[in-house]
Amino acid sequence: MPENLPEGILRVRESAEKFIEQVIRPIGDADDAEAASQVREASKEAGFFFKTQPEEFGGHPASALELTVLRELFAHANLPLTRHVFGPGPGALHAVEGKLKDEYLAPVLAGEKTGAFGFTEPDSAPRPTWAVLNNGMLTIHGQKSYVTGGATADFVSALVNVEDPEGAKLGTAMIVIDRLSDGLSIEREFSSLDGSSHVAMRFDNVIVAEDHIIGKLGEGLPRALTNIGNVRMMVSAQ
């Protein structure tokens, strides 16, 4: 962290320190739904909740430096309720339009839906997850081995190699797949040292419409890596 921070960020950090002492610490280690709701409402009033959300949804997105300062500060407090301070961000759904914006991004930002990110492939997979595009429908096959929050997410945004019925490569794509889709199964659930939960997921003839592609064909890997980069900045700050 730079030793000389801009005055504006110093003021925000001071405000966050007061928020920890006056709002979060008095609640203690409670982490039930009521306590989480109390922190979220207080965070909205203080303005922290909206710093991870797009302007078009009422957010006031902060700079990478400001978010890093705040995340480091909240993590240093070592209180479980700090994870409820920031509102849900768009994640892999950043800049989507149409159906994906209305039925997935908007509910995520409103806290009505949760999504997971499917990127990592198991070593034992015969080939990376792929989909056949035919007549506007995608038929998906494959596995993802480390999907954080996948057991309870409403949907997963998965990196998939797309081809036509003859096997010609069309490019990679991030595809939104509802967790309860026919053919999607959870093969294993496990936890990591930080207490977060993960699943191994399989796709067997999972069929979704072409309009579930995030962006355009060929943009899948760059979009996935951008999402990973944003998460790594968050984790490093914490």
Locations of regions flagged by a protein language model:
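A generic, well-ordered mixed alpha/beta core segment in the N-terminal half of proteins
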Residues: V96-E112, T139
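A short, Trp-centered hydrophobic/proline-enriched beta-strand micro-motif
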Residues: A110-T120
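A short core secondary-structure module
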Residues: M137, Q143-L184
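N-terminal glycine-rich flavin-associated loop
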Residues: I24, L81-L100, D123-A125
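Glycine-rich beta->alpha junctions and the first turn(s) of the following alpha-helix
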Residues: E3, E7, I186-Q238
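Amphipathic, small/basic residue-rich leader segments at the start of a protein or domain
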Residues: M1-R83, E103-P107
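A structural signal for short hydrophobic beta-strand segments in well-ordered beta-sheet cores
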Residues: W130-V132
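Buried hydrophobic positions in well-ordered alpha/beta secondary-structure cores of metabolic enzymes
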Residues: I20, G47, L70, E97, ...
